Amino acid sequence: MAKRDYYEILGVDRGADKKEIKKAYRRLARKYHPDVSDDPDAAEKFKEISEAYAVLSDDEKRARYDRFGHAGMDGFSQEDIFNNINFEDIFSGLGFDIGNIFDMFGFGGGRRHGPQRGADISYTLDISLEDAYNGLETDIRVPHTKKCPVCHGSRAEPGTGTRTCQTCGGSGQVRQVRNTILGQMMNITTCPDCQGEGTVVEKPCSNCNGKGVVRKTSTIHVKVPAGVETGSRLRVPGEGEMGLRGGEPGDLYVVIKVKPHSIFRREGANLYTEKPISFVQAALGDTVEVPTLDRPVKLRIPAGTQSGTTFRVKGHGMPHLKWNGYGNLYVKVKVVTPRKLSPRQKELLREFASISGDEIHEDKGFFDKVKDAIIH
C-alpha cells in the first residue's frame, strides 16, 4: 500500500512554515494519541502523523522529501527520522506520557540514557453517597513496581556490577553505513545488546531477573474529602510505577466512583428526592419529615399543594468540594390516592364533591350491576 503524502497527512499546504506544521501536528496528536483516543487505529494514525511532522519540521529532510518524495527517506531509519524531535517541547501541557512515545516507534532505549520517571497508575474506589457526604479514610491495596530489595535497582547481582557495552562502546547506538541510490546514508539503530543503555550488567540480579524492580501489592492509606463525586481524582504522590535509572516514581491516582443511592439522586452538589403525601395533606397543608444525609428535617407543605410540586430545602445537599458550604435538597411531593375507602370516607367525599359542584360518576360493583338489571 502506497504511503500517503506527508503534507496531506497533516492537512497543510506545501508552502506551510514550521509554526503551521507544528500547530497542525499538535491538533492531530490531541485527537489520535492512544492515551486519549478510543479509535482502534489510533496508534497507527499517531505514528503516521508523527513521521510526517518529523520529516516536514526538519529542513534537510523536508528538502529531500520535496525533491524525491518517499524515496528520499529510504536511507533513514526510524531513529534517523526522529533524531532531532523534542517531544517534551511539542507535547508540553497535553498530559501525554512522553516515555511511551519512544517505545511506540520501536527505539525506546537509545534516546533515554538518563533517569526516567515511572508511569502513573490509577485505582478505582467505589464509595457510598454517605461516604461522599462525610468523607472517609480507608486502606486500599494497589499492585505496582517497587525497587528490588536485593539489588536496590542496580539490576546486578550483589557483589557484581556493570561494564561498558562492547557492541556499541557505551554510546547505546549502532551505526551502519548503507549505499543507496541517493548515495551513502548513515543508519543509526539502538544497540541490541544493551538496549540503548550503554552498559550491561555482569550478572543479572536473580531476584528481579535484572530488571531492577519487582512487582508487589502495597497497602496505601487514602483520605477521601467530603464532596467528591464520580470521576474525582485523588493524587497520591510517589505510589505509581517505579522509575528507571534513578528516576522518580510515578503517582497513584485514586478515581472515585459513587454508587447509586436508593433515596437520593445527585446533580453536582444538589440532591433530589421524592416524598409521598396524602391528598388531605396536599389539600389542607401539613408539616412532614423528609430524610437528608445528615438528619431528618421538617418541611412545610402549604395548603393546596399539587402533586409534582418541588420544594427546596436550602443547605441540605452535598458539601462543596472546593469551597465551604453545601448544595440544596430538592423534594418533589407526590400525592398518593388511597386505593381503599371506608363507607364513611366515601360518604364524606361525596358530600365534598356535592359542595364543590363536582358531578361524580362512580364505578358500580358487580352486585350493584345485578341489582339494576333485575329492577329494570
Curated annotation (Swiss-Prot):
InterPro entries attached to this UniProt entry: DnaJ, DnaJ_C, DnaJ_domain, DnaJ_domain_CS, HSP40/DnaJ_pept-bd, HSP_DnaJ_Cys-rich_dom, HSP_DnaJ_Cys-rich_dom_sf, J_dom_sf
Gene: dnaJ
Domain J: 5-69
Name recorded for this polypeptide: Chaperone protein DnaJ
Residues forming coiled coils: none
Cellular component aspect of the GO annotation: cytoplasm
Domain of life according to the entry: Archaea
Gene Ontology MF terms: ATP binding; heat shock protein binding; unfolded protein binding; zinc ion binding
Function (record text): Participates actively in the response to hyperosmotic and heat shock by preventing the aggregation of stress-denatured proteins and by disaggregating proteins, also in an autonomous, DnaK-independent fashion. Unfolded proteins bind initially to DnaJ; upon interaction with the DnaJ-bound protein, DnaK hydrolyzes its bound ATP, resulting in the formation of a stable complex. GrpE releases ADP from DnaK; ATP binding to DnaK triggers the release of the substrate protein, thus completing the reaction cycle.
Keywords: Chaperone, Cytoplasm, DNA replication, Metal-binding, Repeat, Stress response, Zinc, Zinc-finger
Any one biological process term the GO annotation gives: DNA replication
Cofactor(s) listed in the protein's UniProt record: Zn(2+)
Extent of the CXXCXGXG motif repeats: 148-155, 165-172, 191-198, 205-212
Similarity remark: Belongs to the DnaJ family.
SUPFAM superfamilies from the UniProt entry: Chaperone J-domain, DnaJ/Hsp40 cysteine-rich domain, HSP40/DnaJ peptide-binding domain
One Pfam match: DnaJ
Cross-referenced NCBIfam families: DnaJ_bact, PRK10767.1, PRK14283.1
Positions with a binding annotation for Zn(2+) 1: C148, C151, C205, C208
Keyword Zinc among UniProt keywords: yes
Subcellular location: Cytoplasm
